[in-house]
Amino acid sequence: MRIMGLDVGDKTIGVALSDPLGWTAQGLEVIRRDTIEKDMNRLAQIISEYSVERILVGMPKNMNGTVGSQGEKVLAFIEKVKEKIDLPIKTWDERLSTVAAEKMLIQADVSRGKRKKVIDKMAAAVILQGYLDSGAK
């Protein structure tokens, strides 16, 4: 079962995909946010192209586990996705995923300019890999 992981921000959406067996996550692309319609169309294209069967959305939470203002924006985004795309959607705690992605890119000696371009899809991959590693389905 192929799963699409999303790291939803105000300006970008990081997209990652699992392999068909659901073992590993790879960063796919960073969608520059435009209109909600264009965002949904691009997600639908990816879903069709890669035969995605489930969507996992990173849920930003405060360190105490509560949902803050960014989490509310993500919940609103999920509602828009549900209106346009008929797939199961789950959320996953994304706390510190961007920090983990940044550390991986630094360890791989990726330049600061390049990191800025790929950090969101790497964060999506970290979120998705955490979900896959947990065995949750």
UniProtKB/Swiss-Prot annotation:
<dbReference type="InterPro" id="IPR005227">
    <property type="entry name" value="YqgF"/>
</dbReference>
<dbReference type="InterPro" id="IPR012337">
    <property type="entry name" value="RNaseH-like_sf"/>
</dbReference>
<dbReference type="Pfam" id="PF03652">
    <property type="entry name" value="RuvX"/>
</dbReference>
<protein>
    <recommendedName>
        <fullName>Putative pre-16S rRNA nuclease</fullName>
        <ecNumber>3.1.-.-</ecNumber>
    </recommendedName>
</protein>
<dbReference type="GO" id="GO:0000967">
    <property type="term" value="P:rRNA 5'-end processing"/>
</dbReference>
<dbReference type="GO" id="GO:0005829">
    <property type="term" value="C:cytosol"/>
</dbReference>
<dbReference type="InterPro" id="IPR037027">
    <property type="entry name" value="YqgF/RNaseH-like_dom_sf"/>
</dbReference>
<comment type="function">
    <text>Could be a nuclease involved in processing of the 5'-end of pre-16S rRNA.</text>
</comment>
<keyword id="KW-0963">Cytoplasm</keyword>
<keyword id="KW-0540">Nuclease</keyword>
<keyword id="KW-0690">Ribosome biogenesis</keyword>
<keyword id="KW-0378">Hydrolase</keyword>
<comment type="similarity">
    <text>Belongs to the YqgF nuclease family.</text>
</comment>
<dbReference type="GO" id="GO:0004518">
    <property type="term" value="F:nuclease activity"/>
</dbReference>
<dbReference type="InterPro" id="IPR006641">
    <property type="entry name" value="YqgF/RNaseH-like_dom"/>
</dbReference>
